[in-house]
């Protein structure tokens, strides 16, 4: 392990995050606007992903239900990755591609925003769930990677990290989700953004 290898890793990671900050401002703004409108009108946020993206989904839901930086009321959010009984029952009876779709069919309301995370943009179970969310009338956001894959064309906001190295995509997704939390708290709970 060399100093150069360590420094190179962090430089490459900075480059990816900086690129998102330069090139994805409009998509970030659109996402926060959708989320703000959803939460103001009594909707909830449903979020999902696989593997590391499942962990990111749970982290984001925890920040909304708990708090991010500001002491404030809880915000309704559900990570569709957490109920092992539902995941295994649906996976066993219907197949892995249906594990999130069935939950969308059970839980989603047209006021909701559904977020799908996929570093490849090709996760079938996320694709099917977002398709179901569109049918319900939800707004949809894709936090994707690489070229956005099949999911990019079916979401209201396509926020693709233009990178092929999965760990860098996941780190950028985490930064974007933290930014969502920060901006949502400011929009919903500070005098300049608050409408209540």
Curated annotation (Swiss-Prot):
Record: residues binding substrate: 50-52, 63, 92-93, 118-120, 123, 170
Broad enzyme group: isomerase
Cofactor: Zn(2+)
Biochemical pathway: Carbohydrate biosynthesis; D-glycero-D-manno-heptose 7-phosphate biosynthesis; D-glycero-alpha-D-manno-heptose 7-phosphate and D-glycero-beta-D-manno-heptose 7-phosphate from sedoheptulose 7-phosphate: step 1/1
Domain SIS: 35-194
An annotated GO cellular component: cytoplasm
Pfam families given in the database record: SIS_2 (PF13580)
Gene Ontology MF term list: carbohydrate derivative binding; D-sedoheptulose 7-phosphate isomerase activity; zinc ion binding
Annotated EC: 5.3.1.28
Record-linked InterPro entries: GmhA/DiaA (IPR035461), Phosphoheptose_Isoase (IPR004515), SIS_dom (IPR001347), SIS_dom_sf (IPR046348), SIS_GmhA/DiaA_subfam (IPR050099)
Cofactor: record remark: Binds 1 zinc ion per subunit.
Subunit structure as annotated in this protein's UniProt entry: Homotetramer.
Miscellaneous comment text of the record: The reaction produces a racemic mixture of D-glycero-alpha-D-manno-heptose 7-phosphate and D-glycero-beta-D-manno-heptose 7-phosphate.
HAMAP family given in the database record: GmhA
Protein name as it appears in the record: Phosphoheptose isomerase
The species this protein was found in: Syntrophotalea carbinolica (strain DSM 2380 / NBRC 103641 / GraBd1)
Gene: gmhA
